[in-house]
Amino acid sequence: MDLKFVIDNLQDLGVLPPDQSLTLGSQYQLIARDEQLSQKAIDKCEKVFLQWSLNRGVNIEVLKRFQNLWSVIKGKDFPLVGFPYSNLTIQQVDVNQYISNQSEKLMKNLTVEEVEITDYV
């Protein structure tokens, strides 16, 4: 598939249907290697992200495609407001059920070790 064609039609779900989204990763890698194509892709990503931030009705599948393309080229996610990140897990846990049963054994397996923070920075 022509890389310029991919960039130009990434928004068109009729031309590049949603079931092809997973196969576009290799195309993104090739785009990232070409300086001109990656600049064109970044410009297009920024336009789509601006439309998203202005609530201009960007399809979530299209947004995910451009977010993936951006992260392949730039090496990090674009900080989108309101983007539903799939790896974010929010859960509340009541720890009392774990602590109350273990109250007599709390310090049995405690290991205290001094570590220099500069070793990890």
UniProtKB/Swiss-Prot annotation:
Q: Which Pfam families match?
A: Swm2
Cystine bridges: which residues?
none
InterPro entries noted in UniProt: Swm2
GO CC aspect terms: nucleolus
Subcellular localization, as worded in the UniProt entry: Nucleus, Nucleolus
**Keywords in alphabetical order:** Nucleus
Please report which protein family the annotation says this sequence is part of.
Belongs to the SWM2 family.
- For this entry, the protein name equals Nucleolar protein SWM2
Q: Which organism is it from?
A: Zygosaccharomyces rouxii (strain ATCC 2623 / CBS 732 / NBRC 1130 / NCYC 568 / NRRL Y-229)
- Which gene underlies this protein? SWM2
